């Protein structure tokens, strides 16, 4: 599977952490500039960690398996290393991993049959609201269930090679299909629950990968999922990826945002 090597461990040279996911874009293309203005890059002490999504000027949603003790975010970026006119940097004042996510799984170096990575989402409260511009925009939470067969778009700066070792400087987009959860039940030894979405290409070649965790899954123009976990190597035939199903969590998200203005 996304061999449980937490992207944090990869980027910082640590070997004591291992997340359930390996999020990256394989088989994608360079996103058009400013086409994903809600895309966020989450950093840990200056090192790229995970993707995220701007759902409110003061709030970013990402994956709970990206949890650590220090965050900053970049908004409005296409290339992670070039000066860009729409880029905005923000510190994070508070983080709220979903209480139902089993953080102990992150520190396991091997994934076991039956491991359950449900509730893989986290809210980040920005210390200063984002300035909404042509290059930085919020995207609404879903209000209805996504339909199997929908065309979806995932994006991120994760690995562009199946082995997860070559990250992208430029934001990558990939078009994948929303599949029935039964397809992922057949594909993976870990638990696939109704709190997850299954998306990918059954023929392989297109997938998210290491480093894409926490980024958006947009189906028919609606934010429906957050990149969570998948098979390692990425993009294998009959091994679609797993995404947190946001429609299941909108009450919790709204409650956290309301209680922490």
UniProtKB/Swiss-Prot annotation:
List of catalytic residues: 65 (charge relay system), 120 (charge relay system), 213 (charge relay system)
InterPro entries: Peptidase_S1_PA, Peptidase_S1_PA_chymotrypsin, Peptidase_S1A, Trypsin_dom, TRYPSIN_HIS, TRYPSIN_SER
One Pfam short name: Trypsin
GO-annotated cellular components: extracellular space; secretory granule
Superkingdom of source: Eukaryota
E.C. code: 3.4.21.35
Glycosites: 108
Catalytic activity: Preferential cleavage of Arg-|-Xaa bonds in small molecule substrates. Highly selective action to release kallidin (lysyl-bradykinin) from kininogen involves hydrolysis of Met-|-Xaa or Leu-|-Xaa
SUPFAM superfamilies: Trypsin-like serine proteases
Family matches, as CDD domains: Tryp_SPc
Enzyme class: hydrolase
UniProt tissue specificity: High levels in pancreas, submaxillary and parotid glands, spleen, and kidney.
Domain Peptidase S1: 25-258
Gene Ontology molecular function: serine-type endopeptidase activity
Record keywords, A-Z: Disulfide bond, Glycoprotein, Hydrolase, Protease, Serine protease, Signal, Zymogen
Signal peptide range: 1-18
GO biological process: regulation of systemic arterial blood pressure; zymogen activation
Entry protein name: Kallikrein-1
Propeptide: 19-24
Paired cysteines (S-S): 31-173, 50-66, 152-219, 184-198, 209-234
Family: Belongs to the peptidase S1 family. Kallikrein subfamily.
């Amino acid at each position: 599977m996304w061999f449980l090597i937490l992207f944090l461990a990869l980027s910082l040279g640590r070997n004591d952490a291992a997340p359930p996911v390996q999020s990256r874009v394989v088989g994608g293309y360079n996103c058009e500039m400013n086409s994903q203005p809600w895309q966020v890059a989450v950093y840990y002490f200056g090192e790229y960690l995970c993707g995220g999504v701007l759902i409110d000027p003061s709030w970013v949603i990402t994956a709970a398996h990206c949890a650590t003790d220090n965050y900053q975010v970049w908004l409005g970026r296409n290339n992670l290393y070039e000066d860009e006119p729409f880029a905005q940097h923000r510190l994070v004042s508070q983080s709220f991993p979903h209480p139902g996510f089993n953080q102990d799984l992150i520190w396991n170096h091997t994934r076991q049959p039956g491991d359950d990575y449900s509730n893989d989402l986290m809210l980040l409260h920005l210390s200063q609201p984002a300035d909404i511009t042509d290059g930085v925009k919020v995207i609404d939470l879903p209000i209805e269930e996504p339909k199997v067969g929908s065309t979806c778009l995932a994006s991120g700066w994760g690995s562009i090679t199946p082995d997860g070792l070559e990250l992208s400087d430029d934001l990558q987009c990939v078009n994948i299909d929303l599949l029935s959860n039964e397809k992922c039940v057949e594909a993976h030894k870990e638990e696939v629950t109704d709190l997850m979405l299954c998306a990918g290409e059954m023929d392989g070649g297109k997938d998210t990968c290491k480093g894409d965790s926490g980024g958006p899954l947009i189906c028919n123009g609606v934010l429906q999922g957050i990149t969570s976990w998948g098979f390692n190597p990425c993009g294998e035939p009959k091994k679609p990826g797993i995404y947190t199903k946001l429609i299941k969590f909108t009450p919790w998200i709204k409650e956290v945002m309301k209680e922490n203005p």
